[in-house]
Structure formats: structure tokens, C-alpha cells
């Protein structure tokens, strides 16, 4: 019995060595206005607000989060804001920034001049969150700091806030999401001008969004 207890104890210790440094996106919050979609369909690329939260369990003894911040700055707008605070189980890094939204035709040229790790691709009024080549490069650089550091998608929680500034009613559609803490297999909600709706995509191991990109559709 004592042998089993000691064995289990060392298993926990060994696992902890791998778990403690882990730092991956906990939450993404993205805000889109319906008029932005119309502008994108006309050929524009628009930077939309993005807020990201990372959590690091345990102490950051090697100052890995500040180092990760310096790397991330190369791939984000100059006015991006970074904050590192103490959480319940470790440090939390919050980034307030923006990512480009455009079509498959307009985004490549924009990204050449403005490297970003993420982008929103609009196709037939469907909004798809995708990673870019810059994210792959960033992740490679992060692993040089700590092999457990990563900014891979999907985040544990991705929240889209859709606000209507269109004269006509707009309908938001999504699959396997939460809204107002309620689960929906097929979500559909119409919003009037100056109204908004939040849709949350869960990114756990059993989530469909481990296999396909986070996406929703608007009927304008």
C-alpha cells in the first residue's frame, strides 16, 4: 500500500513538471460590426478589435511571459496593449490588439505589409477565424523560450460579439455554440440596429472546433 502511495506521488510530481509551465490561449474576444462585413465585401481590409488572455500555471521564475510579450509585439499593431497580472494559480497575460478581416483575395497583400498571427476571412457573409504563417513562426520562436508555450487555435473560449449598425435586421447563425450561457446546436438570432449578440465557441478536447475553424454566418 505504501509503495503505491509513493508511486502515485512521484507520478503527480513528474506530471506537474510538464503542466506547470503550460501557457496557451484561454480566451479570445472578437468584436465585429455588420457594416465591416459590407466594407470587406467591397474589397477593404479592416482591423477588428481582439482581446486575448493567456494563463501560466505556477510561478514564472524565468520571466517567460515578458519574453513572450516581446516576441508577440513583432506580429501585432504598434498600439497593442499588454498586461501581466497575478491570477489564482499563476500569471495572466492580457493582450488588447486587433486582427485583419478581409477576403481571400484582399488579405494576402495586406499581410505581407502587416504581419498578424490571426485573421478573419469573409466568404459569402461567413466569418472564419484562421491562423496565418506568422502564427507558425511565432509558435516556433515561443518554443525556444519554453516548449510548452503556444498560441495555437482554438482557444479554450472564443467569443464573437456581433453588433448591428445596419438599417435592416441582421441574422446571426452558428453551430455548436453558447449564447448567454445556454448551449445551442444550431444558433440563430436576429438583431436590430444598435443591438448586439455574443456567441461563444468552446475549444476543449471534445469540441468540433478542434477539427474545423471557428466560424459563423450573417444574413444581411
Q: Model-derived features: where do they sit?
A:
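Bacterial N-terminal signal peptides that target proteins for export
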Residues: 2-10
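C-terminal motif of bacterial Sec signal peptides marking the signal peptidase cleavage site
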Residues: 19-22
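Bacterial signal peptide processing site
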Residues: 24-26
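Envelope-exposed proteins and targeting segments
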Residues: 28-32, 48, 125, 156-158
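Post-signal peptide N-terminal segment of mature Sec-exported envelope proteins
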Residues: 31-52
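Post-signal-peptide N-terminal segment of Sec-exported extracytoplasmic proteins
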Residues: 45-71, 131-149
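Mature, soluble, non-transmembrane domains
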Residues: 75-220
Amino acid at each position: 500500500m505504501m509503495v503505491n502511495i509513493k508511486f502515485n506521488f512521484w507520478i503527480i510530481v513528474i506530471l506537474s513538471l510538464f503542466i506547470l509551465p503550460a501557457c496557451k490561449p484561454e480566451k479570445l474576444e472578437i468584436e465585429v460590426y455588420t457594416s465591416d462585413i459590407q466594407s470587406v465585401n467591397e474589397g477593404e481590409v479592416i482591423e477588428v478589435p481582439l482581446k486575448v488572455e493567456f494563463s501560466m500555471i505556477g510561478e514564472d521564475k524565468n520571466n517567460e511571459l515578458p519574453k513572450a510579450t516581446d516576441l508577440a509585439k513583432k506580429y501585432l499593431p504598434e498600439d497593442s496593449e499588454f498586461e501581466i497580472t497575478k491570477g489564482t494559480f499563476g500569471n495572466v497575460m492580457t493582450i488588447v490588439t486587433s486582427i485583419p478581416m478581409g477576403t481571400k483575395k484582399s488579405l494576402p497583400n495586406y499581410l505581407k505589409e502587416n504581419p498578424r498571427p490571426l485573421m478573419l476571412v469573409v466568404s459569402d457573409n461567413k466569418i472564419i477565424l484562421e491562423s496565418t504563417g506568422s502564427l507558425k513562426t511565432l509558435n516556433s520562436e515561443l518554443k525556444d523560450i519554453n516548449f510548452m508555450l503556444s498560441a495555437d487555435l482554438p482557444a479554450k473560449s472564443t467569443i464573437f460579439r456581433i453588433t448591428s449598425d445596419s438599417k435592416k435586421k441582421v441574422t446571426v447563425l452558428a453551430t455548436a455554440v453558447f449564447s448567454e450561457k445556454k448551449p445551442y446546436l444550431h444558433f440563430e438570432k436576429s438583431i436590430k440596429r444598435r443591438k448586439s449578440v455574443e456567441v461563444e465557441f468552446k475549444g476543449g478536447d471534445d469540441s468540433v472546433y478542434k477539427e474545423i475553424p471557428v466560424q459563423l454566418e450573417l444574413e444581411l
